[in-house]
Design a protein with these regions (language model features):
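Metal-dependent nuclease catalytic cores that hydrolyze phosphodiester bonds in DNA/RNA
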Residues: 1-101
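Generic beta-strand/beta-sheet core signal
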Residues: 107, 230, 278, 299-301, ...
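C-terminal extensions
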Residues: 192-302, 308-312, 318-319
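Short, amphipathic alpha-helical segments that act as regulatory/interfacial helices
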Residues: 46, 50, 54, 128, ...
Length: 473
């Protein structure tokens, strides 16, 4: 059977939805702590919507499809957890709302900030199909807005249903590609990853996506081993691997997969000056729907525990207060270090500074203008690494590079910590009433953020052991 909620796994990966339907015997699949948090928050949002509707209307919970039909025939104002089906399709809308015409309108409570997410479009589109009355479906968003989904979702619904029927008819899992970011977070990672490794799947390599892999396979290069042995000058251009330099990097990436080799393509240019390492932690699940940066972490000389400084906010109510405290701290550093380099890893920190400048209309603020101007002290350490070095990692993320024993070999205090982990810790912190446990959660997050900025510092030190060219800050 095909359920409306299958759309999430289907959009993520066709292999994942096949495994959802034909789960291997003996394989225990446990959602991550972050997924559990999302489920818990989603259930809380649904309960709040249910409570508000129950205050205004007669609300009855359905226990089966027959019961749902009976409630509809009886004219119940709102049916909670109704069950609908047609052929091989099953739908369980959170709410069926009776209109004055006597027709029922499907509605779901979604923690999302927008109804544009494809899985929501498909799921609500299926409810519309099952009801068959042409009414738009409602979405009670996490932002408090109520939006509608209509016939614009019909094409995606039909595409989903056709694909699902093809997948369910397969005797074995469909052939899919590997994606480090998507697969690493999947509950079936430990099932699928060994299969990708056994076949030498090209997309295990950083920089090789499904389109590039297909182009290489058409040339007979269908494994990592074959790519490592290939002559880049003899490889034809393929999507996203156009030009000799990109093909050469792909071959080197394949070689490093087997022998952990490091290949420096050209000298790395780093700015001179006093480096202060910078990292932020944000909560994307805030009540107002905007990312709340609750921790601005900074590591200044002499780069030890005592040199770790931070701005912390206890809730999104202190959002502006935390932002302005961060700007004040940067102004303090600017006065103290005339050659300041504010080093970070990847573009995330700059994105957040821009977002906060927009949020509070502070682009003219002198510190903001400096941070976002032509003479910015901000320096993304990832950029010269990606440009100048090929590393034996599946992803050029900070932890991949730092934790590798043949690279930086810096380890985080909590090996399970990460960006999603920190969100879980902070949301738990917000809901924790016991002072000791609340302080423990805060301390765990601060330790993680300290490790992030220290990891960036250790990465800088490691990069400086390579061939480096300094330039003025």
């Amino acid at each position: 059977m095909i359920t409306a909620s299958d759309s999430t796994s289907w959009l993520h990966c066709h292999g994942r939805i096949w495994l959802d339907k034909f789960q291997p015997a003996g394989e225990a699949v446990e959602p991550s702590e972050f997924d559990k948090l999302i489920i818990r928050m989603g259930e809380g949002h649904e309960w709040n919507i249910k409570r508000e509707l129950a205050r205004q209307y007669q609300l009855v919970e359905a226990v089966s499809e027959d019961h749902t039909r009976a409630l509809m025939e009886a004219g119940a104002q709102i049916i909670y957890q109704g069950q609908l089906s047609e052929g091989d399709i099953i739908g369980k809308p959170d709410f069926l709302i009776r209109l004055e015409s006597g027709q029922y309108q499907a509605a779901d409570a979604k923690l999302a900030r927008s109804e544009e997410k494809k899985e929501i479009q498909i799921q609500l589109g299926i409810y519309r199909k099952l009801l068959g009355n042409g009414l738009n479906a409602l979405v009670f968003l996490g932002t408090g807005d109520v939006t509608e989904i209509g016939e614009e979702a019909d094409k995606d619904v039909e595409k989903f249903l056709q694909s699902m029927r093809e997948i369910l008819a397969m005797k074995a899992m469909p052939q899919v590609r590997y994606s480090e970011s998507k697969c690493r977070a999947c509950t079936y990672f430990n099932i699928c990853k060994p299969q990708f490794e056994a076949k030498g799947e090209l997309t295990l390599l950083y920089g090789i996506d499904s389109r590039a892999a297909l182009g290489l396979e058409k040339q007979g290069i269908d494994t990592i081993r074959k790519l490592a042995d290939a002559n880049p000058a003899q490889i034809e251009d393929v999507p996203y691997l156009k030009g000799y330099e990109k093909r050469y990097r792909a071959v080197l990436q394949a070689k490093s997969y087997f022998d952990d080799s490091i290949h420096q393509l050209k000298p790395i240019t780093l700015p001179n000056g006093t480096w202060i390492h910078f990292d932020v932690e944000a909560n994307p699940l805030s009540d107002n729907g905007e990312d709340h940066v609750y921790l601005w972490g900074l590591l200044k000389p002499p780069y030890n525990g005592q040199a770790f400084e931070y701005i912390w906010t206890d809730s999104e109510k202190q959002d502006r207060e935390g932002w302005e405290a961060f700007l004040a701290k940067i102004a303090e550093y600017r006065a103290q270090y005339t050659d300041l380099v504010l080093a970070h890893f990847s573009g995330y920190e700059v994105q957040k500074i821009k977002a906060y400048a927009d949020r509070y209309q502070m682009h003219e603020h002198p510190t903001v203008a400096w941070l976002l101007g032509d003479n910015t002290p901000l320096f993304d350490l990832l950029e010269p690494i990606k440009e100048c070095i090929v590393l034996p990692v599946a992803s050029y993320g900070l932890k991949y590079i730092c934790k590798h024993p043949k690279l930086v070999n810096f380890q985080w205090d909590d090996s399970d910590s990460g960006s999603q982990w920190s969100v879980v810790q902070y949301v738990n912190y917000l809901g924790e009433l016991r002072p000791d446990d609340r302080e423990r959660l805060k301390r765990n997050i601060l330790t993680y953020n300290f490790d992030d900025v220290m990891g960036t510092r250790k990465l800088e030190e490691w990069v400086r052991t390579r061939e480096v060219v300094d330039h003025p800050a």
